[in-house]
Amino acid sequence: MKVGFVGLGNMGSAMAHNLIKAGHTLTVYNHTRGRAEEFRPLGATVAETPGEAASGAEAFITMVADDRAVEGVIFGQGKVIESLPAGGVHICMCTISVALSHRLLAAHRGQKQHFIAAPVFGRPDAAAAAKLFIAVAGSAEQITRCQPLFDAMGQRTFVVGDDAPAASLVKVTGNFLITTVIESLGEAFALIRKSGVDPGKFLEVLTGSLFSSPVYRTYGGMIAADNFEPVGFSMPLGMKDNRLVLAAAEEAAVPMPMASLVRDRMLAATAQGLGDADWAAIARISLREAGL
């Protein structure tokens, strides 16, 4: 497929590489031009603007940081809403608010374009290995049309509904669950350490028995080692996603006390000098509260 791709950070860069490997034709754009230029030797076209990347594209992928960045690309100076051809599909693969997902769906329909929300679960190493999990919502016809793209980037695609905002909600709710696991692990390892038990042995028990999922293995390993480098998902992005799930919960009148707790943990981590760390560093708050 002819694909426009905007957002070549750690995740987007790996995803774009895999699309090229799979034989798709890419036109790329990144706010920091040097990241885009890295793709020129691979056969990609480097666009001057997001709108240029979307012009003539069958599919246009956004993998940027937040709602503001997506809005800038689609409605602002990027002007993708004007340049994506009728019949083209915008695939938003980043984590955005449910409200923005609704707005994008309506705006693209108004231009006779299509919109799919397809946020991903996985860190940069999973993106590089094409092992992402992709939650997709939108029209069945467009999802089928875009499946080769998803296959190039991920190990499994989950269709969660025919209304694009459903995937955005699944993503922010899934990220909420990850943060609750991180918080629980932080508390558990604080108890283990203060009681003199080997954190590595505790991790072995967890991941070798009932807690063998990637979330427990990845974050349990980081917390057991008290090592949060390299940063795979930063604290500011974690705080952004926490705000998104709390906003969705407020809209639906659903209390989420754990989300509020995690929000305070992230604020505490930021106040204590961990604002640039991986979001898993909230586990250090439990250590400090335990006097460790």
Regions found by a protein language model. Give the residues of each.
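Hydrophobic beta-strand scaffold residues
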Residues: 26, 46, 115-116, 157, ...
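Rossmann-fold dinucleotide-binding core
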Residues: 95-176
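Rossmann-fold NAD(P) dinucleotide-binding segment
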Residues: 50-114
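Helical "substrate-binding/catalytic lid" subdomain
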Residues: 164-290
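Hydrophobic residues within alpha-helices
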Residues: 15-16, 35, 104, 149, ...
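NAD(P)+-binding Rossmann beta1-loop-alpha1 motif at the extreme N-terminus of oxidoreductases
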Residues: 1-63, 88, 93, 124, ...
